[in-house]
Amino acid sequence: IPAAGSEGSSSCVISNDSIDAKFGVNSDLIRPKVSFLDPELTFTLPAYQTAAGVTDMIAHICERFFSGAGSSEVTDNIATGLIRALINQAPVAIAEPENYEARANIMWSGTLAHNDLAGCGLNAVPTSRAGGWESHALEHQLSAFDTSITHGAGLAVMMPAWMRFVWREDPSRFLAFADLVFGIEPVDETEEAVADAVTAAIDELQAFFAELGMPTKLGEFGLKLENVDAFLATLKANKGEAFGGFKLSLIHI
């Protein structure tokens, strides 16, 4: 499935079902020396998995875009161009599973989304990859707790929710996302106009996920409020009290 980006990334995830945990591992020792991509191998991929894969790709890009380390005009346009391409191509691939151009564009986007190209120049720490990876850390608690939850589907819920929670920490960055991806600009520079523009962009992203058949609420997984304490305990064990580029604190969740 094109999504994880394993054909070009330095990342992998290790799951331990006995303790309901998923851990991310990153090392250039994991990155393949060479890979060959054949879009025709994805023709039989079900619509749901195609949608979940596209959601994961967009999350890989957004994690880097919202790195908290400023901006780069070239990288920003690469990143948001990939998102726009995925928004355009995903519905085509779902409607026409054997559409070679759509499948090829999605597969190539998945590689570029996670081979670090979309984060060049956005590293807060030069020796680490760009981004705080907050949405991924949050989603890992869901799919570790319930292995029937597809990673991309979990991200469709967690990423927009995370964006709504933190955007005020860096409004200019979220305005850039709104403009470059959806062409949304605030009508003026007032706080209300900025909030409206950012919220509209997040709404558009969430609506796109829903259009693909992805969930938008935790309740769609059958999860309940009492499950949150277990998620937070695992998250604290893995990440500490605060983590990510926006320093998301567990006391605020």
Question: Predicted segments — roles?
Answer:
Residues 35, 251-253:
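Conserved small/polar residues in nucleotide/adenosyl-binding loops
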Residues 178-251:
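C-terminal charged capping/lid subdomain of soluble metabolic enzymes
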Residues 1-77, 81-82, 176-180:
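A glycine/threonine-rich phosphate-anchoring loop and its flanking beta-alpha core
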Residues 51-54, 103, 155, 228:
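Short runs of predominantly hydrophobic/aromatic residues within well-ordered alpha helices
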Residues 64-204:
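Active-site segments that bind and position negatively charged phosphate/pyrophosphate groups
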